[in-house]
Design a protein with these regions (language model features):
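Repetitive helical segments and hydrophobic/amphipathic motifs
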Residues: 11-14
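Bacterial N-terminal signal peptides that target proteins for export
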Residues: 1-8
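N-terminal segment of the mature folded domain
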Residues: 22-179
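N-terminal signal peptide c-region/cleavage motif recognized by signal peptidases
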Residues: 16-18
C-alpha cells in the first residue's frame, strides 16, 4: 500500500511540473522592441516597463537562478507615449548576455542573436511570471547564418564600452571581425 501511495504521489508531482510548461501568450499585433547589450540598465527595466505599460507581465530566461541574462516585459502602452496608441500591445525584450559588444556589433551588422523562447516557458512565482528557455544562435557560432536561426535582430543596443575598442582579437563576439 505504501508503494502505491508513493507511486501516485510521484506521478502527481511530475504531472504538476509538466502542467506548468506553457507558452507565453503574445497577442496578435504586438509590437516587439528588442534591446541588447550592457547590463547597466537591467536594475531599472522593471520600473521603466511599469511606467510605460499597463498590465505588465515580467518574463525571464532560465539561464541563471539569480540574475537572468535575458528578460522581457509584456503589456499595453500607457497614456503619454508619443506616437503610440494607448493599449497597443508591446513586448520589450532585453538581452544582457555577452555585455556591451552585443549592444554594438549585432545592431551594426543586423545579425540575429539568441533571445527568449516564448514558446518554451514555465510559470513561476515572484518578480517574474514566467521562466523561459532561449532560442537562436549567436554570430560566430556554427549555424548562425542558417535561415532556420530563430534568433532576433536587436532594434537598438547599449554599451558602456567605447565602440572603437571592439577590435580583434578582444571585445568581439565569438571571434567575429571588427566593425
Amino acid at each position: 500500500m505504501k508503494f502505491t501511495k508513493i507511486a501516485v504521489a510521484c506521478g502527481l508531482a511530475l504531472a504538476a511540473l509538466s502542467a506548468q510548461a506553457v507558452p507565453v501568450t503574445i497577442p496578435a499585433g504586438t509590437q516587439v522592441v528588442f534591446l541588447s547589450g550592457a547590463s547597466a540598465p537591467d536594475n531599472f527595466l522593471a520600473d521603466l516597463a511599469t511606467s510605460m505599460l499597463t498590465n505588465v507581465t515580467a518574463i525571464r530566461s532560465s539561464d541563471s537562478a539569480t540574475t537572468p541574462l535575458h528578460r522581457a516585459f509584456l503589456g499595453q502602452a500607457a497614456a503619454g507615449i508619443p506616437g503610440v496608441a494607448v493599449g497597443t500591445p508591446i513586448l520589450f525584450i532585453k538581452r544582457s548576455q555577452g555585455g556591451s559588444v552585443f549592444g554594438v556589433d549585432p545592431v551594426a551588422r543586423a545579425a540575429r542573436i539568441q533571445t527568449i523562447d516564448f514558446n518554451n516557458c514555465t510559470a513561476t512565482t515572484g518578480a517574474f511570471a514566467f521562466s523561459c528557455a532561449t532560442t537562436g544562435i549567436d554570430p560566430g557560432i556554427a549555424g548562425h547564418e542558417s535561415a532556420s536561426n530563430t534568433g532576433l535582430v536587436p532594434d537598438f543596443g547599449i554599451s558602456d564600452v567605447e565602440p572603437a575598442l571592439f577590435a580583434e582579437p578582444f571585445n568581439t563576439e565569438n571571434g567575429q571581425p571588427a566593425l
